[in-house]
Structure formats: C-alpha cells, structure tokens
Regions:
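Cytoplasmic helix-loop-helix junction between adjacent transmembrane helices
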Residues: 106-144
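Extracytoplasmic
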Residues: 12-46
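Small-residue-rich segments within alpha-helical transmembrane domains of MFS-like 12-TM solute carriers
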Residues: 25, 29, 95, 111-119
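Juxtamembrane helix-start elements in MFS-like secondary transporters
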Residues: 45-53
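Conserved MFS/SLC helix-loop-helix module at the cytosolic interface between two early adjacent transmembrane helices
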Residues: 62-101
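Residue-level signature of mid-helix packing/kink "hotspots" within the transmembrane helices
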Residues: 29, 57-65
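Helical-face signature of the major facilitator-like transporter fold
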Residues: 20-25, 57, 91, 99-111
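Transmembrane alpha-helical cores of Major Facilitator Superfamily
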Residues: 22, 54-58, 85, 108, ...
Length: 145
C-alpha cells in the first residue's frame, strides 16, 4: 500500500474500518445460510424464517441515515465502538432465542446497531485520507463486501 502513498497511520485506520465493516457485513449475511437449521430448531415456517431475516434489514434501513448524523454529532470513533459492542451483546443474546418474537426483535435490534457502521467508517476515511487518496481508500474499504 505504500505505492499508493498511504502512511502507517492511514494503513492502520484502513485495516480497522475494513475489519469493522466486515464484521457488520458478516452479521448481515451469515443468517441466510443458517436459516434452514434455525427454522428446524425453532419450528419456524418458511414465512417466519423470511420475515426473521427481513427484521435486520428493517432496523438497518431505519438507522442508516440517523446513524450517519449520529457519527457526525458524537464522532465516528464512539459510534463505531458502541455499534460493535452492541452487536456483540445482541449476537450473544441470540444464543438464547427460544421463540420467533424474541428472535425477530433481536434481529431488528442488530440492524439498528449495525446501521451507523458504514457511515462512521467512511467518516474515518474522510478524516484520514486526502482528496487524492480517498478513492483508493474507499475502494479497499468496500472490498470487504
């Protein structure tokens, strides 16, 4: 990456936001492959499984714009930290799912706390990378998806 002209600090920031968004992205997509097992274990119908998956995206869609505003108001570092810690807690709580409603609420909340992540990561890139570096930095950042 030194050929691109990134400093060590910039590389550290880029790796950090890349890993942060990767975690958020995996949270978003991993459940689709788990749904056959979840449906069977929790006696979900196919329709319940579909709406269960959709709960994340409903929460995410609600929080993307306010999450970006929140990152601007309180800072992207704090927003990323709170989002990651909240994702960890909610993911741990998912191991206690015993019914559809509880699982749906947790998926929805996971979407809510994941919403600010992308905007916060892009704010960090905006702060640490100059105008001639941002395109490459954003391209590398988005490669985790």
């Amino acid at each position: 990456m030194s050929r691109i002209g990134f400093s060590r600090t910039q590389i550290l920031i880029l790796v950090s936001v890349w890993l942060t968004f990767l975690i958020s992205f995996v949270m978003r997509l991993s459940w689709a492959s788990l749904m056959p097992i979840v449906n069977e274990a929790l006696n979900f119908t196919p329709q319940m499984g579909t709406t269960y998956l959709s709960a994340f995206y409903m929460g995410y869609a609600i929080m993307v714009l306010p999450g970006g505003i929140l990152a601007d108001r309180i800072g992207y570092r704090y927003t990323i930290l709170v989002s990651l810690l909240s994702m960890a807690v909610i993911t741990a709580l998912m191991s206690t799912i015993d019914n559809y409603t509880y699982g749906w609420v947790l998926r929805f909340l996971l979407g809510i706390v994941s919403g600010p992540v992308q905007a916060s990561c892009l704010s960090a890139i905006g702060d640490y990378f100059g105008p001639n570096q941002r395109g490459a930095a954003v391209g590398i950042f988005m490669s985790c998806t």
